[in-house]
Regions:
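N-terminal and secondary-structure boundary signal
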Residues: 1-322, 328-332, 337-344, 351, ...
Length: 372
């Protein structure tokens, strides 16, 4: 397994600058073969949001990626993602990703159109996944994540981005099945091993800090990352924003598998080093180990639910809420409703049912749901 991660400076979303940075990064990291192959580019689209909000992979970044893989000989280029609540015929209009795809003669694909079962008998947490049938059309899968914090997983990068290959609300069933961070991380690692993505181009030109992956604030970082080793990309990115990589659940579980790396020290940086580009004041999700988290592996499963009484929970800012109902539709445990309270209709949460997956926080277009 290639252990090189190339980190290159890129000060803005000028398509030519991004293309040049991506090309240099791929040349340094090596190991990308797309000649004569069908390539699926998988950007990160939590929901269809404008580029300046830093919620989605930037359209100019996608444009540079399309240009690069085409010049490297790709025979067909597919682009798509499946947000949590995609409207019928979802086409990435607000984010600009659909228009860029069309303008560059790539093919926008609907992940929700058809599903298939993807078996992975060696799975530690999950041995079968329901994924988009688009996977069958791709010889090469390239993850195009956005560098962001994440309320549930602390950080989201190249590996977490592939969760979007599970169509729309089907993702909610995995949150119910794997409500703890550690078990959810194991499932994500199994998914990556089942899909076997070939490469990652990370959009770290403008990242998101604070309560990501959608409720945080844009933060200029000025970098692009590239490698065929998705774990190594995520380790490098987590160092850049100031996380100890071994403390992040996906990194930790993936390292234990020994497939991508046997030690974080094995990673080679032929370009910039993540430590020299580290941003000490990047606003992160605070990593805390409560006594309840430490007891999760000792207590019987029914008693583990007691920890939820002490865990952070989603709360509603009623002054910002527009009662669009997206949070109700995404809630896997059916813990949310709109009811008459105090003389007005409000979103309410039944914390006895809430599993603290924070999908409601992630999907809210008005930043009206926060975690406390």
């Amino acid at each position: 397994m290639n252990k090189k991660v190339a980190i290159e400076s890129c000060p803005s979303y000028d398509p030519d600058l991004i293309y040049a940075a991506l090309k240099r990064a791929v040349e340094l990291a090596g190991d990308l073969d797309v000649a004569g192959k069908s390539v699926l580019l998988k950007p990160n689209i939590v929901f269809d949001a404008a580029p300046e909000k830093a919620i989605c992979t930037h359209p100019a970044f996608l444009e540079a990626a399309i240009r690069l893989v085409r010049e490297m000989g790709a025979s067909r280029i597919l682009v798509g993602d499946s947000p949590g609540l995609p409207p019928p015929g979802f086409a990435g209009k607000v984010s600009g990703l659909g228009e860029v795809t069309k303008r560059n003669n790539a093919q926008w694909v609907d992940f929700s159109r058809e599903k298939m079962e993807l078996n992975y008998p060696e799975g530690k947490a999950q041995k079968k996944f329901t994924v988009s049938r688009v996977l069958q059309e791709a010889d090469v899968v390239i993850s195009l994540p956005k560098l962001k914090t994440h309320q549930l997983m602390y950080f989201t990068g190249a590996m977490k981005n592939l969760f979007g290959l599970i169509p729309s609300v089907t993702k909610s069933t995995y949150h119910v099945r794997f409500p703890e961070r550690e078990s959810f991380a194991s499932m994500l690692v199994d998914l990556n091993l089942a899909i076997r993505p070939a490469y990652a181009f990370m959009d770290a030109i403008t990242g998101m800090e604070g309560p990501g992956p959608s409720g945080g604030d844009p933060r200029h970082v000025g970098l692009v990352l590239a490698s065929s080793n998705l774990l190594a990309v995520d380790v490098a990115a987590s160092i850049i924003i100031g996380y100890p990589p071994k403390e992040l659940p996906v990194n930790k579980d993936a390292l234990e598998r020994g497939v991508w790396l046997s030690s974080f020290d094995e990673i080679e940086y032929p370009g910039l080093s993540p430590l020299e580009k580290q941003i000490p004041d990047y606003v992160k999700i605070i990593f805390k180990k409560s006594n309840w988290q430490l007891l999760e592996f000792i207590l019987p499963r029914p008693l583990r639910k007691l920890r939820l009484s002490f865990a952070p929970k989603p709360k509603i800012d009623h002054s910002a809420c527009i009662r669009c109902g997206d949070c109700l539709r995404i809630c896997a445990s059916k813990a949310m409703d709109i009811a008459e309270t105090g003389g007005e209709r409000r979103v309410i949460i039944d914390y006895r049912r809430c599993i603290r997956c924070f999908c409601c926080h992630e999907i809210c277009p008005e930043k009206a749901i926060f975690v406390k």
